[in-house]
């Protein structure tokens, strides 16, 4: 603001000071004394002696311009130093006429914008790192310090424990894995190691024991599960091998689910013998039977036992399939039943078996009708199932 100089003895000065002829003498705002000088300085409606209007910081007399904050007045430089923008490095105010440097939101003097390590002033285009406390580090010094820190961390000093010291610590650990403070102090005095070294050694030892126990339990259970997996794998491979062998044997037999007549010969007790001298009902030995054999005739007992699982000839699955055999001759007409409790009654002429009945003494009876080739609803599909319906208790 501009200072206003007023003369006290003229009407003009009275008008400038705002007086209307009042005999009241103004009082100085600096020394609180009445102003009887020829000239009076006026700042914000306050009157000053010429010698009392000074800068609050540098005490220089203010003649033309001054800056006020509260009850204090300042010169231009001191006002901006105190209340203006401050440098982030030196924390001093920056006058508005000076050239500054900026880094993000921080403002620096030109001479303060320098590396804190090498003290080199940074110019436009230089690369630098801005630290958290607003300090500046040039790129070369930053990378050097970082590399030095990494090397010091990698080459930290290691404590060497002798064999005697180690033996003492092991004995103490066997007595108490977690010793009290006075025990650690005693061990420190005995071994000559630092208290911190003794404490860290016990901590590492306890962690190692815990890790070894955990690893041992994991290995035990791992071996157990591996054995279980191996045993399951072996059993599964056995089942797979059985299943793989099954289709090979099934491919060689026409009817796989039914027992062969040779097996029924001795197990069921119904067909006890089969020979050439057995009585034949309704046919001769020279005629073609149910089996289309190359030499012709009825199969003998030795030939019949050769009908095994690897034979291309199979046993008919149901009585309905007998109608499709050559000559439509019943298979049961070629078999002899020496047991007295079971008989076969055939009706019809030679080579023709229109109807037959299997009669058991005390067992159930069923009719076989050859009137059609569509099948027999009274009997199930398997010959073993309907042959087993005969009561075996009487035999």
From Swiss-Prot:
Residues 28-78, 87-141 form the LIM zinc-binding domain. It is found in: Nucleus. Residues 257-278 have a biased composition (Polar residues). In dorsal regions at neural tube and tailbud stages and in adults predominantly in the pituitary gland and weakly in the eye and brain. Keywords: Activator, DNA-binding, Homeobox, LIM domain, Metal-binding, Nucleus, Repeat, Transcription, Transcription regulation, Zinc. Residues 208-304, 363-383 are annotated as: Disordered. SMART domains: HOX, LIM. GO terms for molecular function: DNA-binding transcription factor activity, RNA polymerase II-specific; RNA polymerase II transcription regulatory region sequence-specific DNA binding; transcription coregulator binding; zinc ion binding. The keyword Cell cycle does not apply. Gene3D superfamilies: Cysteine Rich Protein, Homeodomain-like. GO terms for biological process: neuron differentiation; regulation of transcription by RNA polymerase II. PROSITE patterns: HOMEOBOX_1, HOMEOBOX_2, LIM_DOMAIN_1, LIM_DOMAIN_2. Pfam families: Homeodomain, LIM. Residues 154-213 bind DNA. Its main location: nucleus. One of its GO terms (cellular component) is nucleus. Coiled coil: none annotated. It comes from the Eukaryota. Interacts with ldb1 and with the N-terminus of rnf12. Transcription factor. May be involved in the specification and maintenance of differentiation of distinct neuronal and neuroendocrine tissues. Early marker for the pituitary and pineal lineages, it may be involved in specifying these lineages. This is LIM/homeobox protein Lhx3. The gene is lhx3.
């Amino acid at each position: 603001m501009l200072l206003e100089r007023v003369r006290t003895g003229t009407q003009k000065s009275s008008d400038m000071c705002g007086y209307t002829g009042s005999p009241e003498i103004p009082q100085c705002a600096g020394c609180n004394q009445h102003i009887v000088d020829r000239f009076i300085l006026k700042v914000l409606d306050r009157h000053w002696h010429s010698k009392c209007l000074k800068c609050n910081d540098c005490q220089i007399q203010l003649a033309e311009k001054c800056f006020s904050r509260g009850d204090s007045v300042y010169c231009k430089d001191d006002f901006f130093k105190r209340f203006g923008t401050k440098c982030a490095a030196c924390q001093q105010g920056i006058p508005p006429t000076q050239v500054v440097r900026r880094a993000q939101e921080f403002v620096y003097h030109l001479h303060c914008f320098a590396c804190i390590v090498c003290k080199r002033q940074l110019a436009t285009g230089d690369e630098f790192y801005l630290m958290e406390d607003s300090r500046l580090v040039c790129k070369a010094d930053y990378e050097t310090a970082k590399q030095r820190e990494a090397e010091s961390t990698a080459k930290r000093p290691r404590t060497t424990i002798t064999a005697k010291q180690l033996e003492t610590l092991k004995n103490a650990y066997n007595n108490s894995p977690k010793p009290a403070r006075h025990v650690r102090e005693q061990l420190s005095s005995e071994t000559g190691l630092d208290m911190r070294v003794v404490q860290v050694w016990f901590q590492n030892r306890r962690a190692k024991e815990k890790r070894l126990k955990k690893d041992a339990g994991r290995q035990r259970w791992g071996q157990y599960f591996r054995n279980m997996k191996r045993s399951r794998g072996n059993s599964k491979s056995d089942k797979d091998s059985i299943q793989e062998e099954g289709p090979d044997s099934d491919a060689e037999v026409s009817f796989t689910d039914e027992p062969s007549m040779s097996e029924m010969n001795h197990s069921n007790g119904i067909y006890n013998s089969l020979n050439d001298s057995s009585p034949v009902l309704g046919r001769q030995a020279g005629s073609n039977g149910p089996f289309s054999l190359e030499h012709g005739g009825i199969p003998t007992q030795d030939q019949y036992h050769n009908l095994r699982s690897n034979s291309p000839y199979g046993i008919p699955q149901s009585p309905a399939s007998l109608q499709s055999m050559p000559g439509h001759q019943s298979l049961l007409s070629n078999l002899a039943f020496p047991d007295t409790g079971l008989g076969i009654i055939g009706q019809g002429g030679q080579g023709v078996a229109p109807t037959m009945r299997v009669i058991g003494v005390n067992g159930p009876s069923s009719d076989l009708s050859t009137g059609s080739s569509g099948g027999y609803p009274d009997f199930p599909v398997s010959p073993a199932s309907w042959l087993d319906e005969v009561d075996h208790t009487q035999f």
